[in-house]
Amino acid sequence: MIMNKMKNFKRRFSLSVPRTETIEESLAEFTEQFNQLHNRRNEDLQLGPLGRDPLQECSTFSPTDSGEEPGQLSPGVQFQRRQNQRRFSMEDVSKRLSLPMDIRLPQEFLQKLQMESPDLPKPLSRMSRRASLSDIGFGKLETYVKLDKLGEGTYATVFKGRSKLTENLVALKEIRLEHEEGAPCTAIREVSLLKNLKHANIVTLHDLIHTDRSLTLVFEYLDSDLKQYLDHCGNLMSMHNVKIFMFQLLRGLAYCHHRKILHRDLKPQNLLINERGELKLADFGLARAKSVPTKTYSNEVVTLWYRPPDVLLGSTEYSTPIDMWGVGCIHYEMATGRPLFPGSTVKEELHLIFRLLGTPTEETWPGVTAFSEFRTYSFPRYLPQPLISHAPRLDTDGIQLLSSLLLYESKSRMSAEAALSHPYFRSLGERVHQLEDTASIFSLKEIQLQKDPGYRGLAFQQPGRGKNRRQSIF
């Protein structure tokens, strides 16, 4: 009798003292309870109206009876059989959320997903994966809220938006579809290239939404672009910041060129910058995948001010050096605060180039006289001028790098990969060369922007609003 009293006392005492439970124990208990309820529901569903088990009734029916081999069951039958066998686990939720992009879903959404959407025990097929993403909200226009109109171009309108899934800001590039022509080739090209580019210095394509009337590209949102940055620092950048932006530009471009992709439209408006100072290549509408060392392309590419002389003269055979000339022009513009060759026509653009670098000859540019445009224009014989007199804020290494990019003969221009190792960037340290592709240069504590001498304040916040946003991503 005394033993019974002791047992009752221990039981009451244990019930009166709250028990500390670990997160792992709570999750394990939750999982077990869910599985019990799930199995009980399956048992109820499996019992027919007369208390019979429909699976037992069907057990005498084999796949071979219908002429189907076991491996040839319809997807619906296979799915139903897996439904009756699957169990929920926390690992399933993790697998379900292994998305092809860096995304953080709200906690309440994860809880809802745990309760309502258990996963299959086998790895998801491509079709199932797409269906899974669609269930979450990807590929649906209603997932995004339009906030401000950033600009409008010939084929597209760009909006600042917000994702209902993550609450993050996004840029919605809405491309109008003409029923006679379908999606513009520039949009198709941009999507096909960007979906395979994962780099810290290349804008991320988060989602793609296709409706009858439009094709919407959902990009990560960045507050400003390089042109706006220059405007808001009074066109007077810190030379340290010039170096950091230049390194990021080359880093993203080297990644593209390594994958045989030419951007073909480099300009400050297409280099987006966020509040952290991360610079990212954007607007791949004119970009091309290059499968051979040289190939014939259109010469109507690259904004006039950043177009290399060989393309200006009508060359349609080019490779990665087409982008490197533009890099040189952008480097000069950051260092001086003004465009290097602001021509309004092709002839004027060539005139400005020749006046600074000297009129080319067969000795300085083999094959130049073969261009009919060069013979037709009959340019004066200009002598080359020293670049240091036009960009005095650049140090010796900076001038040497600039000179190696602004070369007439395209094959002689320094590559993006080689430029990253130029002595000009030595002051950034060695660790910048050891970063993973998706790691930001600012993940290194020694890399920080300095205050620009001409800084006017709010350099990042104001440009991204309303009509002041440059129409740079159409």
Swiss-Prot record:
GO MF term (any one): ATP binding
Catalytic activity: L-seryl-[protein] + ATP = O-phospho-L-seryl-[protein] + ADP + H(+); L-threonyl-[protein] + ATP = O-phospho-L-threonyl-[protein] + ADP + H(+)
Region (Disordered): 44-87
Modified residues (Phosphoserine): S14, S74, S89, S98, S117, S132, S440, S443
GO CC terms in record: cytoplasm; nucleus
Domain Protein kinase: 144-425
Pfam family, one: Pkinase
Family to which this protein belongs: Belongs to the protein kinase superfamily. CMGC Ser/Thr protein kinase family. CDC2/CDKX subfamily.
Entry function: May play a role in signal transduction cascades in terminally differentiated cells.
Protein's recorded name: Cyclin-dependent kinase 18
Naturally occurring in which organism (per UniProt): Pongo abelii (Sumatran orangutan)
